[in-house]
């Protein structure tokens, strides 16, 4: 059955996104990243590789992403078909990795397949796949999932070699897109559910996992300390990102967007992402930031709603750990791009939801069957 689900994921993903191979490059960042970037068009040379690791071009430091574009140009030149197919390859691989990761952690076939299918086919993710310049999203997520896989392997039998692989894959992900700064937080949540490396005495949650961790229940602060090397990598990546975004003029100052405008937009955006996830209409390449035109009371109401949902998630964390895991995955992974630290002039962006919505998909996949089972009884 696992093979059937994998085949179905591959076939449906390719069927939906195959037309992208006939798309051209566009004038929104594709020039800056590929068609008019002479370092990328130089292909893989000593100078271009050095440039990839030292440049702040496009107000980002993501050398692995630059190298991937150079490899594409090495094989496909200026033909956009190959560049689009590379994005599609990574997105398809990501869907398969997500399925295997969830299945390995939880042992539940259909829920894992459902989450992977939503991830593969949700309209919110079209921007990340169909836009060549957004290679960094699909590439960094590829390393995100590989890091999770390596961490699961490490949790079964902790050791330096296994942890080194986790750190290496995490570093490659950070060098693809700094969105991975929240991954140590996700790994810590995984320690509670589904890996069960941390468990309270009164836990009542389901025992999906028996063989996929070391069997040792560890103290919370021990697990936090375990993530310290990853936190160091996160800190370094964050500092580098702030420096290059500030030097590139992407980081907005308080005069451009006040603190109240940032807070209000951030709170409203959290719920707007959810609304578009449920009913994906009005998707756009750019959502202008409303600035002070957005009433503060809307932000306050949205903040109250977010706190209320978070309180419910914590209250039922032992009976429904998947709900807390999915909800805080969503809140946490979206936090770096929610707009408190404002980069650019957008209020939100479809590409920012590529990883965060996985948390919501997990809530739906595990929550709906559980609710239906309770209603039947």
What is each PLM-predicted segment?
Residues 1-377:
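Polytopic membrane enzymes that build or remodel cell-surface glycoconjugates and lipids
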């Amino acid at each position: 059955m696992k093979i059937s689900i994998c085949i179905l994921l591959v076939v449906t993903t390719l069927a939906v996104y195959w037309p992208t191979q006939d798309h051209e490059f566009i004038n929104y960042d594709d020039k800056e990243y590929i068609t008019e970037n002479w370092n990328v068009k130089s292909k893989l040379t000593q100078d271009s590789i050095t440039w990839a690791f030292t440049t702040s071009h496009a107000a980002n430091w993501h050398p692995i992403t630059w190298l991937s574009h150079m490899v594409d140009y090495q094989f496909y030149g200026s033909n956009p078909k190959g560049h689009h197919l590379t994005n599609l390859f990574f997105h398809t691989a990501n869907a398969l990795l997500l399925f295997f990761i969830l299945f390995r952690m939880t042992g539940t076939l259909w829920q894992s397949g459902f989450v992977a299918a939503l991830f593969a086919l949700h309209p919110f993710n079209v921007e990340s796949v169909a836009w060549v310049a957004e290679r960094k999203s699909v590439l960094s997520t590829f390393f995100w999932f590989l890091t999770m896989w390596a961490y699961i392997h490490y949790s079964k039998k902790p050791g330096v070699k296994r942890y080194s692989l986790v750190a290496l894959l995490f570093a490659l992900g950070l060098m693809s897109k700094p969105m991975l700064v929240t991954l140590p937080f996700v790994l810590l949540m995984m320690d509670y559910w589904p890996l069960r490396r941390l468990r309270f005495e009164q836990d009542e949650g389901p025992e999906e996992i028996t063989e996929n961790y070391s069997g040792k229940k560890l103290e919370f602060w021990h697990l936090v300390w375990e993530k310290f090397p990853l936190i160091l990598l996160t800190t370094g990546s964050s500092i580098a990102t702030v420096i290059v975004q500030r030097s590139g003029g992407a980081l907005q100052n308080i005069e451009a967007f006040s603190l109240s405008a940032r807070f209000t937009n951030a709170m409203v955006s959290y719920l707007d992402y959810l609304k578009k996830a449920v009913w994906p209409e009005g998707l756009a390449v750019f959502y202008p930031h409303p600035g002070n035109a957005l009433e503060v009371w809307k932000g306050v109401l949205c903040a109250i709603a977010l706190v209320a949902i978070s309180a419910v998630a914590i209250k039922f964390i032992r009976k429904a750990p998947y709900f807390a895991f999915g909800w805080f995955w969503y809140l946490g992974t979206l936090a770096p791009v929610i707009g408190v630290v404002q980069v650019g002039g957008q209020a939100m962006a479809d590409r920012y939801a590529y990883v965060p919505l996985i948390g919501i998909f997990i809530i739906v996949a595990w929550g709906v069957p559980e609710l239906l089972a309770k209603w039947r009884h």
